[in-house]
Structures are given as C-alpha cells and as structure tokens.
Amino acid sequence: MSTAVAGKGLEGVVAAHSGICWIDGEAGVLSYRGIDIHELALNSTFEETTSLLWTGILPSELELREFESQLTLARSLDVRIIDLLRSAPASASPMEVLRTAVSALSFYDADEKDSSHDANVRKSFNLTAQFAMIVAIYDRLRKGLEVVPPDRSLNHAANFLWMLNGVKPSETATRTLDIALILHAEHELNASTFAARVIAATLSDVHSAVTGALGALKGPLHGGANEGVMRMLYEIDREGADPVEYVKGMLAARQKISGFGHRVYKTEDPRATHLRKMSEQLGKDAGQPKWFEMSRAIELYINADKKLNANVDFYSASTYATLGIDIDLYTPIFAISRIAGWAAHVIEQLDDNRLIRPRAEYIGPPYPSPYIPMDKRG
C-alpha cells in the first residue's frame, strides 16, 4: 500500500476514478462526459446537460422529452417543508435555509433508505426540482410575498425565475440563466462534490450526501465569491469611485479581490469566457451596462498587473445583478445548478462503492510520550 503523503489541501492528489468530468487546467479545458463546455453552453440546455451528466450520453429527442417531463413532474414540495421555510428566523441566510430544508426533505421520502441506482436517480430528479423551488419560495416568503406555484409549461430556468419574481421571464433572461446553470453544473472533485462522495461512500442516503455538499458550498472559500464581487461593485458604485483606482486601493490594503485565480486553471476559466459575453449582452439588452463595464475595467487591470484571470464567479456576479437577483441568492443558485453534478457523483459512487478512508500524516508529539501525573505537571 502506498504511503505517499499529500500536500495541504490535497492539491494535485487524484482521489477518485470518475467518468463524469475532465479538466485540463493548463489548457483551460472543461468537459462533461467528454463534451467541451463551450459546445454545451452554445447548444445545450440545463435539462439536456443534466441528463448527460447522469447517464453518460446525450439523450435522443424522445429521451430528452421524457427527462424534461420527469423533472417538471418533480416540482412538488410537502406543505410541511413550506411551513419550515415560513418559520425560518429573519437572521437565516437563504443558503442556511436551503441546507436545512434539503435535510428535512428526507423525512417525506418513502424510499429514503433505498440506495439502489433507480432510487437514486428518482431522488435526483426530485432534489433538482426541489432545490429551485425552495430558494424561490423562501425568497418570496421572507419578503412577505405570496408563493408562486410552479408552471410546468416552463423549463427549469424559466420556472425558477417565474417562481422567484411572479413574472414570466423574457427569452433573454431565461437563456442567460439556462447557460449559467450549464456552466456551474459540474466541476470534477471540488470540495462540495468530494464531501458528497465521502458521505455517499458510507452508504448514507442521498439527502445526507447533498446536505453535506451544501454545507461545503456555503463556505466562502468554495461558494460565495460572486457575492463578494457584487458587494465590491455595489460599493464602487455607491461611492462613485473609479473601479480601477478602487481596486488599487484594495490591493494596497492587502485585501483580496474576489473572482480571480483558480486552484486548477492556469489560464482563463472557460466558464468565465461565456459569462463575460452574457454579462455584456444582458447589460446592453437591459440598458444597464454599468455592472459589466465596471467588471471589465477591473478584469483588464488585474490581468495586466497581477497576471490573474477571471474565474466563474467574477462575471456571474454582474450577470445575476442584471437579472435583478439579490446577492444572497447567488450561492443558492450555484447549488440549484450544482445539484446536477452532485447527483451524478453520488450515483457513480454508489454504483461502484468503496468507503473513502484516507490516512493522516502524524505531526504531533513523539510516541511514546509519558503520561505525567497531575501533581508532577508544571
């Protein structure tokens, strides 16, 4: 057995065999089941991409229609979950509420303890539909608004915007969010996905695995960077400051600029390429170009001065802001997308399971160290 010691953070360590996602960080390549993310962003939908992630192949037209039908039929929440959302304290963040509600969903799943492949797929349909419903419903409840029932004639992205705002979204808004969901749907063995696989490997249930993933995504070193980007942009706008000068001041004060650099990519994050274009076009269409223009000025400066590239979080901030989405919903929307990838990994893990149990390199006091009686301790 190998006794190789990994570096801190397991950087560069291969910890699983997976056929779901491939990344070439040097070349800036991201693919789902071998298909380049650029092709999916240009040609696919979130539903089709999710089907690809779960099954390993692109669906036929009939298979896609069936997949879409199953996902829309899963748009249902037990009234007790809605009561739970209603009872959440005002201090609770949407991410905390989503995590808690998803854990509670297991109470009302008759097959919670069934970890067969078919049961896991069924639960994945339910969770994918329910994530979006929970976020939209909670946002309306906390604002004192009526809950908007799902519209089964709308696709996943459009239905979320409909339930969130109570207004049928434009084709531009729908397609923008649809592409954003595709881009965020999967990213190999990131912290939340690894957490989900570790939990699933113990033969715990799917709800526990994705609840653990949500807990990991809630951490600011994983999810939430786009929230930091947008708070910075709002502050620049509030002060009427020049974006580049503002960022120079942050750097002089040794403050981190959110949305730049990536643990895996050594060149531009391929997801940022699409989000940049979307942010620009959406801003033009909405007559609100300032968020993109501020972001672009900052990106050009950071790239030239610090040799850092924008990551997926940087332009998702201005994209969501132009869609009128509140900042504290950005990470929950990440989860609405990433449940597709989490589910794929849980299914893959349980289809060929082995408990994940690494070792730790001991760096404590030498063995054997003596036990010192209380009266002899200094």
Summary of predicted features, one role per range:
Residues M1-G378:
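Non-transmembrane, aqueous-exposed alpha-helical and coiled segments at domain scale
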